[in-house]
Amino acid sequence: MDHLTMPKFGPLAGLRVVFSGIEIAGPFAGQMFAEWGAEVIWIENVAWADTIRVQPNYPQLSRRNLHALSLNIFKDEGREAFLKLMETTDIFIEASKGPAFARRGITDEVLWQHNPKLVIAHLSGFGQYGTEEYTNLPAYNTIAQAFSGYLIQNGDVDQPMPAFPYTADYFSGLTATTAALAALHKVRETGKGESIDIAMYEVMLRMGQYFMMDYFNGGEMCPRMTKGKDPYYAGCGLYKCADGYIVMELVGITQIAECFKDIGLAHLLGTPEIPEGTQLIHRIECPYGPLVEEKLDAWLAAHTIAEVKERFAELNIACAKVLTVPELESNPQYVARESITQWQTMDGRTCKGPNIMPKFKNNPGQIWRGMPSHGMDTAAILKNIGYSENDIQELVSKGLAKVED
């Protein structure tokens, strides 16, 4: 396979990934591949570009390092071109409503006829099969959270609240990335392709597993948090200091003992309710749970964040200031690790945002390109798979492809 023009870098150099999907979930999977060195082709509708393009800044992050192909993959010669592209593709990711591709004639079996080793990842809200009531429904972040039992666990004791920004989309995208790589590992052993069915609600069901297990195996459901505090454990969660907010985790035998001395509860250690060796204090089951919270709230409110961080560092209690977004860039840890970076957009502007993660030591990722324009790489991609200039112009004239203006 001849590759498109791009630098060679990262652990996935030489891999070809194609994705079809809009907004966040499916494209986030593609973005991860692109930042780790894969050649990633982003398929967009010919008439209407990805709706993410209306956002002024986010797509410059989420679509960097991509090659843009504008092609009607379901109709006539456009479909033929898509299937031709699949012959040299390692991983194909599609995000749609249920088995939308199969309904339009592009089944797994059709794809495998053109590439028996192809890894296919289907990403949808409710999966590729199930009941007629749900399978074909549209889904976004909040839908997946609501249907999975994840949303009902979040928010305050008085009202559930979805987790933002777009948690279900990002979790589902990462699931598609890891599942596709797992499948590719097996394909390279067996030579036989794989199809992966990723339902966003099942991803979020798994992400919400911690508290659910008590219900599934005992019938008790943990209540939602109160003012950002862990619903299970005292001394864990969000707390207010004299000049702002921190989060902390009061976990460990020594940590609890030393903290209790500071907040005036040392006399409770060694009691039947908080015996020696206690590593966590259950907010509900321990009768002293509310008292621990009361004393801790009072102590923290009387101290600044700097004082709390200094003292908790001495006691080895996990703690962090709740940073505002403007504080991120100047934070010394961010600076040392270059967590925020800059890159050039296709029109020459400077864009700033999160750097590539995680950091590979021997084969690091890199940002080599900004977000491509609609149809920017259509001609190059079609030429790469054997199409002539005349072939490409014919696709364009029939409205089956769009090339850059």
Swiss-Prot record:
Pathway: Amine and polyamine metabolism; carnitine metabolism
Alphabetical list of Gene3D superfamilies matching this protein: Crotonobetainyl-coa:carnitine coa-transferase, domain 1 (3.40.50.10540), formyl-coa transferase, domain 3 (3.30.1540.10)
Record: residues binding CoA: K97, R104
One GO term of the biological process aspect: carnitine metabolic process
GO cellular component: cytoplasm
SUPFAM superfamilies from the UniProt entry: CoA-transferase family III (CaiB/BaiF)
HAMAP family: CaiB
Membership in a protein family: Belongs to the CoA-transferase III family. CaiB subfamily.
Full protein name: L-carnitine CoA-transferase
Biological source species: Escherichia coli O127:H6 (strain E2348/69 / EPEC)
Gene giving rise to this polypeptide: caiB
